Amino acid sequence: SDSMWYREKGFGKHDWLYCMLLNFGGNVGLHGRMNQLVNGYYDACAHVNGKRMRGVGATPEGIENNPVMFELLYELPWRAERFSPDVWLQGYLKARYGGELSPEVMEAWRALEHTVYNAPKNSPGEGTLESLLCARPGFHLDRTSTWGYSKLFYSPDSTSKAADLMLSVAEQYKGNNNFEYDLVDIVRQSNADKGNALLDEISQSYDRKDKENFRKQTQQFLELILSQDSLLSTRKEFSVSSWLTAARSLGNTDAEKKLYEWNASALITVWGDSIASNQGGLHDYSHREWSGLLKDLYYLRWKT
């Protein structure tokens, strides 16, 4: 939606920051609006309401995702003149991976830049498009959480292409931690997009009472969940074990450790008690496409 600073009187006499709200619930997914972020900042600088702007800020509910968007946000105050994200991206990737970029890497990121990182301004839902691998089972689903959305605004071929291109040069970048993180994240997104498309096919087979295709497709869907879990187990950033271990480490007694682990588990599953979860619609609000959760929760839900 339109930025708040664009109101008739802006923020009045108050100083303010140009902020990016990228993520809700810590949900996992490639997402952003690169052009809108850059152009919105310089439009604000040139506007009368921009006289009291004092810098930039990030206001996500979950920050450990989409590093490219945070790097782009924090680049803004250092550049006096409007710049093209298209040009900036190449420099960012050189700095992130080091040395010269292979053409395959650049092509992969161009595919992402013009799809997942070019989300429509008024797209439904909050934050990233949701992976239906993490949803409560059902047919014709269009979201995983109450206020989310899962219908792609781009072709899944684009993320599949990006994943294939990154995989094609994986050996060349072996041992490069930033590349390997991005590789896993991009392949994860491609798998999630395939899962969303596959669930649509499953729903259609169910409607047609096509038992043969239904059985085949549901088995593929379950196998995809396990494959996704296996992929994400290669990175601690996508592991529920890392999340729970970090929570327990904050406790000073056994009771505190158990309490913090319980709260960390509840946050990413039911959120709170049954009333908040079901009647309040908060179940899966903070779902995470993570290793451990996929195999031990989402897979079992769908299989049942």
What are these regions (language model features)?
Residues 1-102, 106-113, 118, 122, ...:
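Catalytic-core regions of glycoside hydrolase
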Residues 149-174, 179, 184-207:
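C-terminal substrate/ligand-recognition segments
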Residues 170-183, 231-246:
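Short, solvent-exposed, charged loop/turn and helix-capping segments
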Residues 301-304:
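Short, intrinsically disordered, charge-balanced linker/junction segments flanking boundaries
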